[in-house]
Amino acid sequence: CFNAQLAGGETSRVPAGSSAVISIAATGSVARDSLVLRSTGRPGDVLMVTGRLGGSIAHKHLHFMPRIEESDWLVSNFKPTAMMDISDGLAKDLPRLAESSACGFELNFEVLPRQEGCGVDQALGDGEDYELLIAMAPKQVAELQAAWAKRFPNLELTAIGRLVEKGKGITL
């Protein structure tokens, strides 16, 4: 599924009635011109997310496929200024991206794409979404949204806010 190789490992017996513990380490490489960091956003960049947020309490995260194809396409065709996945919830990961980029942020709570049955609080805080959080130059947004709708018609891409100068914006 992910073209990965198992390079080693060790198994041992787990005492009856105990839970198994599995630990995995992964490494990778990326060409410099394909590298997008969370620390390279700029004031004025539009903040976008893929998919819908929230729902881990209802086990949505157990049936999720990482956005590898989508992020590869995005970097190859539009080169975001900053990007990361949302693993700890938007309320934790958006401030991390903004702080790493020496920015503040504004967020439009009304447009947050949410899983069915999820409120704004769940969309912000559930975690385990593994959707992409993207910062894009404003001049690219309309073209990106049109191309995205053609390439990934079953996956939403929603503008949810923007990066602003450090010290401005909101706090989550």
Locate each region found by the language model.
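Helix-biased detector of long, well-ordered alpha-helical tracts
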Residues: 1-172
